């Protein structure tokens, strides 16, 4: 039996596994699916030669998170491609908000709100590493840079409150910010959504939202290659039924949802902790629709053709109304649709002349409805003629999401509702959210701080506790990652 068993091969599980292996421990990773990668996988879902990302498609954190800055994906063979436009937000009438990687260019395009956009983001972009370090922390200690933390916090409070329109005079800039805040799958005028929006929009102007050449699978593949180089082992197609399977391991690290911990632990968990896990709420879901296309999407608004990611919902008011409908358990007639067009930078995703379009729409948790018609209508709204380009499509409803990734309960790709309480206390109120009451058993999924995203930081924080508590190793995980070629 190895020193450590990791259950789940998503980016957090693999991040923990690599850190623990770099510390000299023997590590085995078990994955229920036939392929590894969790929320960062790529497959031919529509037609041969059309490669689609199964969940995560654009990666703001691949260049930014402390884990990936130390691991250095490029040094491990991953080519990260940055579109000139990180994201765009088309509006009716053929206009769009365009988040260029260049902050000044973005502000120049925003008319009367350009100065407000620059004032909102310039201090954040200038100190982007400190912003990321704060947002990607375990939320249990004060920020190292108090001034940047204060500036960021005040901006989040503003955008998460009734004051959110105070600095804006037109519709484009607030829509551009709301589109990214709505990644949280919650009404965007809320603190957790505002925090996500401020962080991701900052990164749009600080390195960009990169796409790995060949697909998101390149990220877990690089982590797996490093794990195996260090002597670690990956086992796919193995659904863990009970923690008792690994009784000889000194530590078990779970890149799983709280519901999976409850299942695998059986009656071993103390009542108070088990009740806390059962109270953990899962939020709105995603209905994923992937398209194989005969050509590029014919966006009406200039700038959209250069964007890696687009948010299709309309104005800030329309986004708020759509998300309130989802939160009430109903389907929106015009749902929020997130679209990614990898072909703007990566021609390997489709045969010559072809393109892929990744989309998902927000739906109520557990929804079994195929809403591809509503998705197509939202794309067609801003790109007339899109329908004529569709060669094939693949739909995964919210209810079907857990069959692809067991952490997405009811289709919740955030692995837990992004409420204010669950923003700080994931999955239960504990000073150490990674340790469970079971000796040697830890959680490292997106259901722990800092939450969803391909960043590896939940895995890093959990690995730090495993090293210190179970093995008496106090070396900083980031130092382990920076050590060249450890034996």
Please give the residue ranges for each predicted region.
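Rossmann-like flavin
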Residues: 92-191
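A glycine-rich dinucleotide-binding beta-alpha-beta segment and adjacent secondary-structure elements
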Residues: 170-185, 333-338, 385-449
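Helical element adjacent to the flavin cofactor pocket in flavoenzyme catalytic cores
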Residues: 200-241
């Amino acid at each position: 039996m190895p020193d450590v068993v990791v259950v789940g091969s998503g980016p957090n599980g693999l991040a923990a596994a690599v850190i623990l292996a770099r510390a000299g421990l023997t590590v085995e990773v078990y994955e229920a699916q036939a392929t590894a990668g969790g929320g960062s996988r790529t497959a031919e879902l529509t037609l041969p030669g059309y490669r689609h990302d199964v969940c995560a498609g654009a990666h703001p954190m691949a260049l930014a998170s402390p884990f990936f800055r130390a691991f250095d994906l490029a040094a491990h063979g991953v080519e990260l491609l940055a579109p000139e436009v990180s994201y765009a937000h088309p509006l009716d009438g053929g206009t769009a908000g365009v988040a260029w990687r260049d902050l000044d260019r973005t502000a120049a395009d925003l008319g009367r709100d350009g100065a407000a956009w620059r004032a909102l983001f310039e201090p954040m972009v200038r100190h982007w590493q400190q912003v990321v370090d704060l947002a990607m922390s375990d939320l249990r200690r004060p920020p190292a840079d108090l001034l940047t933390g204060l500036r960021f916090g005040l901006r989040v409070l503003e955008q998460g409150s009734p004051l959110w329109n105070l600095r804006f005079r037109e519709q484009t800039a607030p829509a551009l910010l709301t589109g990214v805040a709505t990644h949280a799958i919650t009404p965007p005028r809320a603190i957790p959504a505002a925090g996500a929006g401020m962080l991701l929009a900052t990164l749009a102007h600080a390195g960009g939202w990169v796409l790995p050449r060949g697909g998101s699978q390149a990220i877990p593949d690089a982590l797996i290659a490093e794990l195996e180089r260090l002597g670690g082992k990956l086992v796919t197609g193995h659904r863990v039924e009970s923690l008792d399977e690994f009784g000889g391991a000194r530590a078990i690290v779970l890149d799983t949802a709280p519901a999976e911990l409850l299942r695998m632990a059986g009656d071993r968990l103390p009542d108070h902790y088990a009740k806390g896990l059962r109270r953990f709420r899962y939020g709105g879901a995603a209905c994923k629709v992937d398209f194989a296309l005969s050509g590029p999407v014919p966006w009406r608004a200039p700038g959209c053709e250069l964007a890696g990611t687009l948010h299709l919902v309309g104005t800030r008011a329309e986004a708020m109304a759509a998300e309130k409908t989802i939160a009430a358990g109903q389907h929106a007639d015009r749902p929020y649709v997130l679209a990614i067009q990898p072909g703007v930078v990566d021609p390997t995703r489709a045969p010559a002349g072809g393109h892929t379009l990744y989309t998902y729409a927000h739906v109520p948790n557990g929804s079994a409805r195929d809403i591809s018609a509503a998705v197509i209508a939202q794309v067609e709204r801003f790109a007339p003629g899109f329908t004529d380009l569709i060669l094939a499509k693949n739909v995964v409803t919210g209810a079907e999401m857990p069959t692809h990734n067991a952490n997405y309960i009811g289709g919740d790709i955030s692995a837990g509702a992004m409420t204010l309480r669950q923003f700080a206390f994931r999955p239960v109120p504990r000073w150490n959210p990674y340790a469970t009451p079971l000796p040697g058993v830890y959680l490292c999924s997106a259901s722990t701080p800092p939450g969803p995203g391909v960043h590896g930081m939940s895995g890093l924080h959990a690995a730090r506790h495993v090293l210190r508590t179970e093995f008496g190793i106090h070396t900083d995980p980031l130092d382990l990652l920076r050590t060249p070629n450890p034996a």
